[in-house]
Design a protein with these regions (language model features):
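ABC-family P-loop ATPase nucleotide-binding domain
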Residues: 3-52
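ABC transporter nucleotide-binding domains
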Residues: 45-209
Length: 209
């Protein structure tokens, strides 16, 4: 099959993305702050015949795949295909009905707690705490992951700067624009430098970061 490239007129959305740094030659503050990860042969995430049943309903049926270190891997499918259920099993939030899975070499059946500390998870529906302010959500995430006091302060300050949250710190997440809600959720997921990051529909409503 042959591939042809053709120039098309610019759209309003293209100019908007370009102004935000998401166009050709644009820079990403987030990418600049994250350490580069080289592709390797080590397996970061693997599952074999992973299945989840809710009574007579099978949400995921014998899912198998491997994700190597440094690889970006996506799950595609219509609503109800089991993508979020698969994520939740890999994050240790749901117990599989059958099959096995490993994250960074840890068996989910035996080391669920340890696995949770080695990954970041940005849920499809916001996993933010509405009764807490933006700052308190960041502080809570840092505390949950057991960061020491000095590291906690440094990481919170870095996340505020990286995701441009400085003007929203005293506001409740529910009062934020959708894009800033997404920024806050991603900041919380990245707080502890996780080697594995699960993103469930992360680009909905978000602008380039």
């Amino acid at each position: 099959a042959q591939v042809r490239l053709a120039q098309v007129p610019a759209r309003f959305e293209d100019a908007f993305i370009d102004l935000l740094g998401g166009g050709p030659g644009g820079t990403s503050t987030l990418a600049e702050r994250l350490p580069p990860v080289e592709l390797g042969s080590d397996v970061a995430v693997s599952c074999r015949n992973l299945t989840k049943r809710f009574g007579a309903f099978t949400a995921t049926d014998s899912v198998s795949f491997e994700v190597k270190k440094g690889e970006i891997f996506g799950l595609l499918g219509p609503n109800g295909a089991g993508k979020s259920t698969t994520f939740k099993m890999l994050c240790g939030l749901l117990k599989p009905s059958a099959g096995e899975a490993q994250v960074v070499g840890l068996d989910l059946r035996r080391a669920t707690g340890a696995v949770k500390g080695r990954l970041g998870y940005m849920a499809q529906k916001f996993s933010l705490y509405g009764l807490l302010s933006v700052r308190q959500n960041l502080e809570f995430s840092a505390g949950v992951y057991g960061l020491d006091t000095a590291t906690r302060r440094a990481r919170i300050a870095e996340m505020i700067e990286t995701f441009d949250l400085g003007g929203w710190l005293d506001m409740a997440p529910d009062s934020l624009p959708l894009g800033h809600k997404q920024r806050l959720a991603l900041a919380c997921a990245l707080m502890h430098h996780p080697p594995v990051l699960f993103l469930d529909e992360p680009t909905s409503g978000v602008d380039p970061i």
